[in-house]
Amino acid sequence: MKTLLLLGALTAGLVACGTDDTDGTNDGGGSDATNGVDSPFGNKDGSGSSDGGSTGDSCYAPVDMYIMQDRSGSMGDDCNIGQTVNSKWCHAINALSGYFNSTAASGNAAAIQFFPLPNQSNALCATGTGYDVAALPTPPPAYTTLPTNTFDSLLNSQNDQGGGGTPTEAAIRGLTKFTAGNRRGGRVTIGVLVTDGDPNGCDENLTNLSNLLQAHFQATTLRTFVIGMTGATDANLEQIAQGGMGPLHAATVGPLTNACGTSAAPCRHWNVGDGDPQAFIAALAAIQQASDGCVDGGGTVNPN
């Protein structure tokens, strides 16, 4: 229940517009006056409208997110949604299902792919081919509107046995191609990379990987967020996330008490430990809030 309340509080910011953020940045502070709880990227004056309308000082800029989920062998044992197998994979698919089905995500949309692909090879490293196509939905449309249980059957059918290694370069190239090629007017497009490991296979140079995301941001103004799970090195993920240009956030964000892991706060990547569903959902909700195109420092709203 605490998680769903947090989701509701964070999502309320998606329809707030015309606020006055005195320093023009998202500093991890702020209070949501409507809900009476701290919002990690909330409007400081609490004056935002929540009616989702297009008149007055309100606006509506929902988020389209492309999630690239690690399914390397280190994610642990397989399970189905609702089961409580103590593995990062099981935690992750339960958290993703919880977020996709939550009414707090209403109006936003998602697409998902997994890495490594079963046919992963070195030839895919420099192109991202296959990773630039969602496992769900099968376009058109490019994204599935939330909330929905449409993803549940896919999550149950997948497992943590991809083609071997953690080909982060291929995943990033596919993610950036997908988000650049699937921008819908009046909405904010973001990429979300979720991994429990350091790059293993393809280009493993952290500067090069960060530069791929930086070049994507400079060309498109689209942000890429990085979520790390136990097994990944926080310093490495933070270096990659710097290129993605997600807003800086504090170490404590809602129920997340170690959101930067071992990296100094504020940081850009998100640490969710072993993928505890409450922490994972809270991170997705905070990322959604950080992408709010209706507040200073939020995501870029795609032109109509």
Residue spans for each PLM region:
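C-terminal "exit" segments of structured domains
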Residues: 58-59, 254-304
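Sec-exported extracytoplasmic/periplasmic mature domains
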Residues: 73, 97-105, 117, 156, ...
